[in-house]
Amino acid sequence: MARFRGSITKVSRRLGVALSPKAEKYLERRPFAPGQHGQGRRGKISEYALQLREKQKMKYLYGILEKQFRNYYKKAVSQRGVTGDNLVKLIERRLDNVVFRAGFAPSRAGARQLVSHSHLLVNGRKVNIPSFLVSPGDLIEFRQKSRNMDAVTDALNRAPDARIPAWIQVDKANQKAVFLSVPERVDIQEPYNEQLVVELYSK
């Protein structure tokens, strides 16, 4: 499976937003773009550049490459409702994202690895595709041989209950989670403007 293999910290500095827990700590120390002129004043940003930056934020935040991201957009357009809202809701339903939201991994990259290595079951069936779309009522749990892994236990212990969203019910003791409902856009607090992404793709 193709995925981004560069430095997410450098990308975070370039975009001016933390795209991972590690990048968040780094940005606190170096809140400017990388490179020789990173601390210099930036000129006026064009409308296209703003739209492109928002798309990059979403892609890197969720770990999605261009082809798949564009497919999400096409699917969002075909659905009823606001295209931007549809786009966010689709991406939030990804299994790797739900695993991260549930606190089973400290980052989406870590969650993606758990899924890819076949550690998880959805409704009792093994699923190793990070982009698998979870539906309301789905039960996500670890395979018997994968339960109580140190990395997962540590992540759950570190994840505050306040971080776990209302649309996911987590049983920490048994390392299970139920996807209760598709979240509304207003409930998703992420540093991007999906409407600018829609404007970019609709040109």
Swiss-Prot record:
Q: Output the InterPro entries linked to this UniProt entry.
A: Ribosomal_uS4, Ribosomal_uS4_bac-type, Ribosomal_uS4_CS, Ribosomal_uS4_N, S4_RNA-bd, S4_RNA-bd_sf
GO annotation terms (biological process): ribosomal small subunit biogenesis; translation
Keywords linked to the UniProt accession: Ribonucleoprotein, Ribosomal protein, RNA-binding, rRNA-binding
Q: Name one Pfam family in it.
A: Ribosomal_S4
Can you list the GO cellular component terms from the UniProt entry?
A: small ribosomal subunit
Q: Which domain of life is it from?
A: Bacteria
On whether Thylakoid is a keyword of this UniProt record, the answer is: no
Q: Could you cite one Gene Ontology molecular function of this protein?
A: rRNA binding
**S4 RNA-binding domain ranges (all copies):** 93-154
Tell me which SMART domains the record gives: Ribosomal_S4, S4
Q: Any keyword ATP-binding?
A: no
Q: What does this protein do?
A: One of the primary rRNA binding proteins, it binds directly to 16S rRNA where it nucleates assembly of the body of the 30S subunit.
- Please state which protein family the record places this protein in: Belongs to the universal ribosomal protein uS4 family.
Q: How does it assemble?
A: Part of the 30S ribosomal subunit. Contacts protein S5. The interaction surface between S4 and S5 is involved in control of translational fidelity.
Q: What is the name attached to this protein's record?
A: Small ribosomal subunit protein uS4
Specify the species: Chlorobium luteolum (strain DSM 273 / BCRC 81028 / 2530) (Pelodictyon luteolum)
